[in-house]
Amino acid sequence: MQLEVHKRLEEKMTKTLGVLKDDFNSIRAGKANPSMLDRITVDYYGSITPLKQVASVSAPEPRLLIIQPYDPSVINGIEKALMMSDLGLNPSNDGKIIRLNIPQLTEERRKELTKVVKRVAEEGRVALRNGRRDANEQLKKMEKDSELTEDDLKQAQEEVQKITDKFNKQVDEMLVKKELEILEV
């Protein structure tokens, strides 16, 4: 039963890392990357739809994204959504496709983005700690219900801490990698 707790904890923490990775990918680092538009939603015939469902996004050059709508009538909606986003990009619409030139990041913007990345990483760590707390509570309940001995509880809690440390280390590695990517000129 205690292995079940550890297994659920690992699954929960793996999902947390996946979310963190997606969050990091949506933060632009100076290079054109189609995943930076993953969070953009477009008003498509009255319903809010993710950009990738109404258009294809490609990066033919390091500082250029091309957005080609599947339905040309939605191009103005896409342009409006891009202008309203927090990416700070100015779309160029030629009626068929939208070009997004990715400007070089200023030193000030780079520092701002590293703060954002650190905050996102801390949110990930908080989620990991919450998972650890939940697992430890389950283990204590199992001990209280006489499903675990005191020694087994201690051993299981140590295993929970090892799992948490392993995932925290991965968060730290992801953070360092993203910071280097942002600060790279």
UniProtKB/Swiss-Prot annotation:
One GO molecular-function entry: ribosomal large subunit binding
The keyword Membrane is annotated on this UniProt entry: no
Statement: the UniProt record of this protein carries the keyword Protein biosynthesis: yes
Places the protein is found: Cytoplasm
Annotated spans, Disordered: 132-152
Source domain of life: Bacteria
CDD domains xrefs: RRF
Keywords in alphabetical order: Cytoplasm, Protein biosynthesis
GO CC terms: cytoplasm
Coiled-coil region list: none
Pfam families xrefs: RRF
Record's signal peptide: none
Disulfide-linked positions: none
Record's function text: Responsible for the release of ribosomes from messenger RNA at the termination of protein biosynthesis. May increase the efficiency of translation by recycling ribosomes from one round of translation to another.
UniProt similarity note: Belongs to the RRF family.
Protein name per the record: Ribosome-recycling factor
Gene that this polypeptide is encoded by: frr
